[in-house]
Amino acid sequence: MSAYEVLVSNITQSFLDHGYEAMTMSKLAKYCNITRRGLYHHFSSKEEAFQAMVRQNNQRTRLGSLSEGTRLLSAGADVLDIVTAVLDVRYGDTRRKLVLSPFALEVNDYAFRLCRPEMVEAATVFQANFAALLQQIIANGQLTLRPTISIETLVQLLCDGARGTNQSFFAPSSEEITARYRQMSQAILFGCAEPAGL
């Protein structure tokens, strides 16, 4: 990790431990073990630091999820295992980290308030990458889409389902979230497609 990535990781932990509203740049510098001047060299405000946190997390989970999906595809895993793993890393890692924070609702609220452009961009890039991975699965003969469903529609449904799982009123615990992604993925996949050869 670069020094900047380490700083943003420390910023992430600081917001999770202390919340957004009461945070100041002075406190953030102290929690990150950096001078205020050093922090201001990178960010002009706590809002910018928070946005950097969201960007880095989105990049980390996007790359990690696609790496895991590609690894499973190469290992010959079935489509449900691949899709579950991709969604679990992309959305579940953040959820598991957030539920440990006493400021989870506050951090989540500010992420939606302050970081919508970053979140939309991350979703757009991830969904295009996820579609490419699913195209490989289809090309391998592991999945056949129904004629009325496009790959983009399938990806949108799966991602909406994962985000909905995270935001549901009866949200699963950290231990249950992988199974919930699997159940949701199975319902969507085999309502939109059928296993190849059937």
State what each model feature region is.
Residues 17-21, 97, 140:
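Short coil/turn segments at alpha/beta junctions that flank glycine-rich nucleotide-binding fingerprints
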Residues 88-131, 142-143:
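Short secondary-structure transition hinges
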Residues 69-72, 101-108, 165-172:
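Secondary-structure edge/capping motif, primarily at the C-terminal ends of alpha-helices
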Residues 52, 66-96, 151, 155-158, ...:
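Hydrophobic alpha-helical connector segments
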Residues 2, 6, 10, 14-48, ...:
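Helix-turn-helix
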Residues 51-57, 61-64:
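Alpha-helical DNA-contacting segments of helix-turn-helix folds
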Residues 112, 123-158, 192-197:
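Hydrophobic alpha-helical bundle segments that form small-molecule/ligand-binding pockets
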Residues 10, 14, 89, 93, ...:
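Amphipathic alpha-helical interface segments
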